[in-house]
Curated annotation (Swiss-Prot):
It is found in: Cytoplasm. It comes from Drosophila virilis. NCBIfam families: TIGR00269 family protein. This is Cytoplasmic tRNA 2-thiolation protein 1. HAMAP family: CTU1.
Length: 343
């Protein structure tokens, strides 16, 4: 039996919003989706008039929808932003080379300037070569570290005021779970921030899609007939994030609001003053922002160039260090008991 659109526009509902459960027609869904992102931008004061903003473009659904909606809202609400596309070529054959064609299509569709930077030109390595040397166990560590710095380098070259990334609500909830499972309190609170960076030496990053569900982003792209690249990275199946994603999907079946619940929990976390927080400074080698000396990118790159790819990998988690400490204390007590019994 046909259902009327809950927005009472007079049309029949054609879809059900995963986020709210509301039955809506396509036009009302588009309006609600765009209005929520506009509210996020305005309420969080993500941009200021006259700013130049780089949209981190991968060709995937998130960055494509982000570019489309930012262009739309910029014109509709007169944000006064100068939007450009910034894409990173990691050098993954059969994945990034194909997705970059989609990015170029986005450039033409949205009439935005596009800058592409590659790992090859920045670091002298491609991910294909890195994986050939290190295997697939830690490839996402290398790629993630290099990609984050590559975006900073590209943003600096373009002279932008901020970088808009396509991180959605699912991504942020997954990251909260990952940091909890790793015992990473330093990153636990920061991962839910809608705006990061922004010191004198770093370009801020903003997440306009922070409260947008992945399912709704897919629906929006589908019904808007946006061109995007949907193939998963060939190295992604080995990523730790995949386990957090699968766990989150299972939880969502039982509790549909779990994504927003986890994000809210992450936002409300407060740590004791005794919890050590990383201090961000400038890497003495590459001059980019880092919380260690030298920065993680420089350490990993040095390992690759010296033929020691695991040089910057292998740091034990806090849980591992706690277990090691307990085992050490237990061994000391056992040794003390042996000495005591000998006398």
């Amino acid at each position: 039996m046909p259902i009327d659109c809950k927005a009472k526009c007079g049309n029949r509902a054609t879809l059900k919003r995963p986020k709210t459960g509301d039955a809506l027609c396509k036009a009302c869904f588009f309006a609600a989706f765009e209005a929520e992102i506009h509210h996020t931008i305005i309420s969080s004061k993500l941009f200021r008039r006259g700013e130049k903003v780089a949209v981190a473009a991968s060709g995937g659904k998130d960055s494509t929808v982000l570019a489309h909606v930012l262009k739309l809202l910029n014109e509709r609400h007169d944000y006064g932003l100068d939007l450009v596309l910034l894409s990173i070529d990691e050098g993954i054959t059969g994945y990034r080379d194909d997705s970059l064609e989609t990015v170029k299509q986005n450039r033409d569709d949205y009439q935005m300037p596009l800058k592409i930077l590659s790992y090859e030109e920045l670091y002298g390595w491609t991910m294909d070569r890195i994986v050939a040397q290190i295997g697939r166990s830690n490839n996402c560590t290398f790629c993630g570290v290099f990609r984050r710095q590559a975006l900073d380098r590209g943003a600096k070259l373009l002279g932008v005021d901020s970088i808009a990334t396509g991180h959605n609500a699912d991504d942020i909830a997954e990251t909260v779970l990952m940091n909890i499972l790793r015992g990473d309190t330093a990153r636990l609170r920061r991962c839910t921030d809608i705006r990061t960076g922004g010191s004198e030496d770093s370009i801020p990053r903003v997440k306009p899609l922070k409260y947008s569900y992945e399912k709704e982003i897919v629906m929006y792209a589908h019904y808007k007939k946006l061109v995007y690249f949907s193939t998963e990275c060939v190295f992604a199946p080995n990523a730790y994030r995949g386990h957090a994603r699968a766990f989150l999907k299972d939880l969502e079946k039982v509790r549909p609001s779990v994504i927003m619940d986890i994000i809210y929990s992450g936002e409300q976390l407060r740590f004791k003053d005794t919890v050590k927080k990383p201090v961000r400074g400038i890497c003495e080698r590459c001059s980019f922002v880092s919380s260690q000396q030298p920065c993680k990118a420089c350490v990993l790159l040095e390992g690759l160039n010296r033929g020691l790819p695991k040089l910057g990998i292998g740091k034990k988690s806090k849980g591992d260090r706690m277990i090691a400490k307990q085992n050490q204390e237990l061994a000391l007590r056992e040794r003390a008991n042996i000495v005591k019994n000998d006398f």
